[in-house]
Structures are given as C-alpha cells and as structure tokens.
C-alpha cells in the first residue's frame, strides 16, 4: 500500500514538474516575442524621428555625391536646389521613400542585431570561446544585421536617389511616385535595376561593423564612470555621436559608390560607370582624384551625427518605455 502511494506521489510530482516546465517555457517564449516586438517598434519610432529631421541634409548630400563637377560647394548646392521650381519643398524630395525605407530598415536592423547578439552571447557563455561582451560578438551581429537590412530595403534607397537626382538641372523628370518608380525601373532596367547599388551597400556593412561595437564600448565605459547607473540622454548622445563620426569617416567612400551606382539611369551622366565596384572606384579616382570618393562627406557628417543621436536616443527611450509598460500592451 505504501509503495502504491509513493508511486502515485511520484507521478503527481512528475506531472506538476512537467506543467511548471511547460509554463516556464511558454512564459520565456512570450517574453522573447515581446522583446522582438519592442525592438522592432522602437526601431520604427527611431527611424521615423530621424527621417523627419534630417531629410534636407540627405538631399544636399546625395546631390553632391552624384554631381562630379569639381566646383560644387555645400552653399552652391543648397542655392541650386532652392532656385529650382518648388523652392524649399525641394529639400524634402525623397521624404516619402525615406520614411518607407527608414522605418522598416531600423526595425529589421535593431531586431536582427539584438537577436544575433543574444544568440552569440548565449553560445559564448556555453563554450567560453570569447570574453564576456566581446567586440567580436557586437561586430558580427552588426554586420549580419546590416547585410539583412541592405538586402530588404535596397530598392527603396534606389528610388529615393532617383527622386532626388531627377530634379537636377538637365534631367528628365519621369518618376511620379514610389509604385510608379518601381514599375518604371523594372520595365526599363529589369529586376537587377532595382538592386543597383546593393554591392556598395553590402560593402558599407563595414560602417555598422565599426559603429556598433564602438557604441557598445562607449556605453560600457560611460556606465562604469557612472557607477553602473542607467545611462542618461547625454551619455547616449555622446556614445552614439562619437561612434557614428568615426565609422562614417572610415567607411564613407562606399556612400559615393552606392549613390553613383543608383543614379546610373539611362538619362543620367553617371550611366558612364560600367563594371563592378572596383572598376567604378578606379574610374572615380582617375577622373576626380581621391577627393572624389569623399564628395559630400562634410554635409554627410552634419546629417548623420544628429540623425544618429536622434535615432539611438529615440530607440533607447522607446524601448525603455515599452519594456516598463509591457503589461499595458
């Protein structure tokens, strides 16, 4: 009798234990799903805020990048943009595709980056291959996230570039909207035409491969100096701006290569660029010198630094708000 009672108790204990494990697993899965949703929502909000504030500087930068005349300055470029029909509105050319591209870009980027970082950290903790919070983990996660984002959103950035450059003097204005642009490019240049500039974009993952490890490192340093207290807005601004400036200077030439490649439509002066990225690189250096690879970098730094500060600050605070109020959603 005692043996039967003991067996029954063991069975009940086993069932209860199994139920608890299932509940824990279910809770863990729900937590992970919520975390992914928080990352994506925070990324969307950050992209939206950055786009609204920095589109005019993006228009100036793109115009400088695709114009290979040697006498162009930031001020003369701004004047030529404002002198065209439309005036100040010209500074917001490409805002629609920018919003359409930026919002999913940051949603994909931040969620992929966080997922990869957590995955690699777990594997590293199991096998102790690298030190904790290794820069290699941050770099690899950033590169994978950057590549995924570039592949997903490349056609949108192509359309944004065409929207901006078709307004330049002597260009034919033929794109009326995002859908019309996509259909027109597909008919004239084929499916591959929608992915012009993807090669330089993938080369540009070097940018995030430098930026995100630096951002994480600066945050870690500032947190130590702050005695491990939560970072405030000033610390986030410092970490994001310094890491962005360094990464932008290191990886800038890919931006010029991408813009020239995306602008190589049939009626563009940049249609003369043929071949792969290396041949385009050599042609620019031969015809314009090394400075040609850094066209628009000054205005780019004026654009990306505040853009990065807005993006990362918005991201961190939206993420914090959603995490603290997860029971209300």
From Swiss-Prot:
Positions on the Mitochondrial matrix side per record topology: 61-90, 157-193, 252-296
Keyword Cell wall biogenesis/degradation listed: no
GO function term, MF aspect, one: NAD transmembrane transporter activity
Gene3D superfamilies referenced in this protein's UniProt entry, alphabetically: Mitochondrial carrier domain (1.50.40.10)
UniProt keyword Lipoprotein, yes or no: no
Organism: Dictyostelium discoideum (Social amoeba)
Function as written in the Swiss-Prot or TrEMBL entry: Mitochondrial solute carriers shuttle metabolites, nucleotides, and cofactors through the mitochondrial inner membrane.
Localization: Mitochondrion inner membrane
One GO cellular component term: mitochondrial inner membrane
Mitochondrial intermembrane side: 1-39, 112-135, 215-230, 316-329
Protein name per its UniProtKB record: Mitochondrial substrate carrier family protein W
Keywords (A to Z) from UniProt: Membrane, Mitochondrion, Mitochondrion inner membrane, Repeat, Transmembrane, Transmembrane helix, Transport
Annotated TM spans: 40-60, 91-111, 136-156, 194-214, 231-251, 297-315
Family per similarity comment: Belongs to the mitochondrial carrier (TC 2.A.29) family.
GO biological process terms held by the UniProt record: NAD transmembrane transport
């Amino acid at each position: 009798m005692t043996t039967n009672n003991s067996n029954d108790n063991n069975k009940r204990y086993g069932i209860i234990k199994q139920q608890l494990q299932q509940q824990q697993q279910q809770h863990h899965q729900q937590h992970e799903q919520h975390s992914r949703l928080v990352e994506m929502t925070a990324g969307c909000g950050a992209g939206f805020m950055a786009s609204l504030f920095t589109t005019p500087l993006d228009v100036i930068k793109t115009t400088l990048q695709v114009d290979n005349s040697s006498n162009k300055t930031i001020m003369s470029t701004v004047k030529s943009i404002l002198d065209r029909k439309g005036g100040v509105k010209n500074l917001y050319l490409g805002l629609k595709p920018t919003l359409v591209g930026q919002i999913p870009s940051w949603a994909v980027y931040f969620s992929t980056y966080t997922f990869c970082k957590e995955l690699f950290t777990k594997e590293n903790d199991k096998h102790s291959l690298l030190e904790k919070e290794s820069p290699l983990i941050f770099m690899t996660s950033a590169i994978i996230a950057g590549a995924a984002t570039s592949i997903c959103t490349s056609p949108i950035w192509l359309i944004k570039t065409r929207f901006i450059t078709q307004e330049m003097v002597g260009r034919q204005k033929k794109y009326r909207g995002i859908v019309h642009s996509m259909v027109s490019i597909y008919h004239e240049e084929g499916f591959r035409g929608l992915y012009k500039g993807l090669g330089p974009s993938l080369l540009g993952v070097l940018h995030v491969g430098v930026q995100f490890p630096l951002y994480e490192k600066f945050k870690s340093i500032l947190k130590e100096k702050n005695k491990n207290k939560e970072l405030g807005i000033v610390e986030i601004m410092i970490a994001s701006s310094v890491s962005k400036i360094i990464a932008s200077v290191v990886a800038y030439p890919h931006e010029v290569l991408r813009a020239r490649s995306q602008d190589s439509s049939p009626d563009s002066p940049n249609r003369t660029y043929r071949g792969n990225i290396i041949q385009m690189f050599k042609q620019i250096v031969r015809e314009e010198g090394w400075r040609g690879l850094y066209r628009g970098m000054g205005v780019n730094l004026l654009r990306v630094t505040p853009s990065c500060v807005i993006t990362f600050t918005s991201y961190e605070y939206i993420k914090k708000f959603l995490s603290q109020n997860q029971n209300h959603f």
